[in-house]
Design a protein with these regions (language model features):
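Residue-centric detector for conserved, function-critical "anchor" positions
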Residues: 1-35, 40
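Catalytic center-proximal scaffold of phosphoryl-transfer enzymes
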Residues: 32-387
Length: 387
């Protein structure tokens, strides 16, 4: 008959080396013990299994991996700097090792990012923007311009999420591949890469902030009275948005119809009249033309309380990439760029939901190895509850 635990005695204590990170930014070598037990009757040895890890049989704990990811993608510390910081703490961790950990962690987190993408594409209105990132060309020592595309929920949505998509170029096919058969309302700038989607059923929503910026730059350049008048009228539209920010979509639509529609109609008529008075090719004509050519898209927000007035929501989520590229300079490959986009998607979405990125990632990386695929959604930033 099989022996019970009462018939066994501990015969050996086997330490298992792991590298962990303490809150004080000190890394240390921990030795979680795995005891061996022997049966007094049959002398059979039994040992506790190794706890499941994100990196199978790897030495970094979930806390250390979370620290490396947050330091690189939230605090913008390139890996060579982290290597030096760990060195001062008494740990010799090569940047090549850190890079391998980043890649392996990104792979393990990809199912979460795929689920996050599905959640974003269930929204009827989403934001889109893109920004350049240098990428090392395969087999060469020089870089070329790649792009990160950002797709986020709106400030009026119950979902707080952003998903980044790293691509080798700014070709519109990358946006089409990400959006798939989604055909909602897309808030974006006037980039031609989105045009094919508009022809296939996506509704274009213009960005009033871009229109305003044209007049702002004109006013800064020559103190234009025309620009000042345009800024005053657009400012009136934004004041209404501030009043309606915390309203329901239906109430926001009502106040827009009552207050914003008359302002927008007056502004449009004024712009048309002013355009007849200025010469083609002038800075003033260009500022007016930007708004007049996009007026339908710029004012669609007036007819739907769920649609924002501008694209600032996603532009704020693009900013971390601008900060990051000034520190880590470039992506080492297309694959590493995609891994970075995956990790950044979760970190920024965690921030949007008010979570500490380190606490979120540490918990997710701890639970992920044993999480059922059918319950992966519980680890998404907008549904996450600490264990």
């Amino acid at each position: 008959m099989p022996a019970t635990w009462g018939d066994r005695f501990q015969c050996r204590h086997q330490p298992r080396h792991q590298c962990q990170c303490h809150p004080q930014m000190a890394a240390a070598l921990s030795r979680p013990a795995r005891s061996k037990w022997a049966c007094r009757q049959c002398e059979t040895l039994t040992q506790a299994p190794v706890p499941a890890q994100v990196i199978d049989k790897g030495i970094p704990t979930a806390g250390l991996l979370a620290h490396v990811m947050v330091a690189k993608f939230a605090d913008h510390l390139p890996l060579y700097r982290q290597e030096k910081i760990f060195g001062r703490a008494g740990l010799a961790i090569a940047r090549s090792t850190l890079a391998r950990w980043v890649g392996q962690t990104g792979v393990r987190l990809q199912p979460l990012v795929d689920a996050l993408r599905e959640a974003v594409l269930k929204q009827g209105v989403i934001h889109a923007d893109e920004t350049p990132v240098q990428m090392l060309a395969p087999g060469e020592k020089k870089t070329h311009r790649a792009y990160v595309w950002a797709y986020s929920s709106t400030p009026f949505s119950a979902l707080n999420a952003v998903v980044y998509d790293f691509s080798p170029s700014r070709a519109g096919e990358h946006a089409r591949n990400f959006l798939g058969d989604w055909n909602g309302k897309l808030v974006c700038d006037d980039f031609a890469g989105y045009k094919a989607g508009f022809e296939q059923g996506i509704t274009e929503i213009g960005c009033m902030a871009h229109a305003r910026r044209k007049f702002f730059d004109l006013h800064v350049a020559n103190k234009s009275q025309l620009a000042e008048q345009a800024l005053h009228s657009i400012g009136g539209l934004y004041e209404i948005e501030r009043q309606a920010r915390d309203m329901s979509n239906e109430d926001r639509w009502r106040i827009r119809q009552e207050l914003a529609v008359p302002i927008s109609k007056t502004l449009h008529e004024w712009m048309l009249a002013q355009r007849d008075l200025v010469p083609n090719g002038s800075a003033t004509a260009k500022a007016l033309d930007y708004s007049l050519k996009r007026w339908v898209a710029l004012t669609r927000y007036l007819d739907d309380g769920a649609v924002p007035i501008d694209n600032n929501q996603v532009e704020n989520q693009i900013r971390p990439w601008a900060l990051g590229r000034s520190n880590w300079l470039f992506a080492g490959s297309l694959r590493s760029g995609k891994r970075a986009a995956a990790i950044m998607s979760l970190i920024q979405s965690a921030r949007m939901n008010g979570h500490d990125p380190y606490a979120y990632l540490k918990d997710v990386l701890t639970r992920l190895p044993t999480q059922r695929a059918s319950e992966i959604g519980r680890l998404l930033p907008h549904q996450w509850v600490p264990a």
